[in-house]
Amino acid sequence: MKGNIGIAVFYMLLLLLPTDSIGKKMEEEQEKLFRQKRNPLIPAIYIGATVGPSVWAYLVALVGAAAVTAANIRRASSDNHSCAGNRGWCRSKCFRHEYVDTYYSAVCGRYFCCRSR
């Protein structure tokens, strides 16, 4: 009878002891994943551009204010500013001699990037 109790205690110890080391290993893996987490990249169209307040807020939420400032992205007081490397202007409606540049309209927020024909 005493031998059976000893064997039962021995097997119980074998079952319970590894749980602590397994828990530590899982915590280490979670910390490793947290350290390896990378920030998303800023889309190339925005680097060095002047953007409206809504686009600025989106970029800050995406990558953070420090990364936005490091990418030389400037915030305009409104969506009415230059676009396409100073070759166009953000407007709500383009003039007759202009066309809407859909590629650069992303930096204009709710406006369109209007460029001369």
From Swiss-Prot:
Pfam families referenced in this protein's UniProt entry, alphabetically: Defensin_big
Q: Name one GO cellular component term.
A: extracellular region
Q: Keywords, A to Z?
A: Antibiotic, Antimicrobial, Cleavage on pair of basic residues, Defensin, Disulfide bond, Fungicide, Secreted, Signal
Which stretch is the leader sequence? Answer: 1-23
Instruction: Please give the tissue specificity annotation from the record for this chain.
Output: Expressed in all tissues examined, including hemocytes, heart, hepatopancreas, stomach, intestine and skeletal muscle.
Q: Where in the cell is it found?
A: Secreted
Propiece residues:
26-36
Q: Does the keyword Disulfide bond apply?
A: yes
- The set of disulfide-linked cysteines is C83-C113, C90-C108, C94-C114
Gene3D superfamilies for the chain: Anthopleurin-A (2.20.20.10), Big defensin, N-terminal domain (3.40.1620.80)
The keyword Lipid metabolism is assigned to this record = no
Example of a GO biological process term: defense response to Gram-negative bacterium
Stated family? Belongs to the big defensin family.
**What is annotated about its quaternary structure and interactions?**
Interacts with intracellular coagulation inhibitor 1/LICI-1.
Query: Function of this protein?
Result: Significantly inhibits the growth of Gram-negative and Gram-positive bacteria and fungi in vitro.
Full protein name: Big defensin
Q: Which organism is it from?
A: Tachypleus tridentatus (Japanese horseshoe crab)
